[in-house]
Amino acid sequence: MESPKYAIVDLETTGHSHQNGDRIIQIAIVIMQDWNIQTTYTKFIHPGKSIPIFIQELTHITDEDVRDAMPFEMYADKIYELLSDCVFVAHNADFDLSFLQAEFRRVGLPEWHGKKMDTVELTKIMFPTAISYKLSDLAAELQIPLKQAHRADDDAYATALVLKKCWEKMMTLPLVTLELIHKRSFRLKS
């Protein structure tokens, strides 16, 4: 049996609500199998509108950065293909997946179906004494490099390493504990 492939995804967007017209401005996907990074995919995406100033300040992604980028529909098939046989992983998976699903619908692709994993929820189980579950704080605590928070490429890479750290910690736990985690994992929000 082949080991699972994970697509660790991070998006930067023009805001928090695809329902209100916010759009993706950067996507990064890290494909990991057997706890090794197989490939990475990163694109700036033209949102079809100006990036709000507070988003530019948060992400350091400007209108100039996306001016010559293609719109999502030019990348949609490739993104869909990358996710097709993977477990979808993100730090706050509901946010990233809901944005992607909205974009897939908008360009006429079917909704993506598959397993998903939220590293926020996973780290709450594996590192219950962490000071914070913000990606930048976890990265610092777990000694994971994070060059620039709120850049999709750096965040996706750090999230991949957080996932790997969770797996490494899981492998140190007794079987009875792993069975309890598995049983209770079905009640997690994600």
Residue ranges of predicted features:
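Generic alpha-helical structural context detector
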Residues: 121-124, 140, 161-164
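Short, glycine/acidic-enriched loop or turn micro-motifs at the edges of active sites
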Residues: 13-15, 121, 158
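A short, structured active-site edge motif that brings together acidic residues
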Residues: 113-123
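Acidic, divalent-metal-coordinating active-site segment for phosphoryl/phosphodiester hydrolysis
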Residues: 151-164
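Conserved non-catalytic scaffold segment of RNase H-like nuclease domains
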Residues: 1-114, 128-150
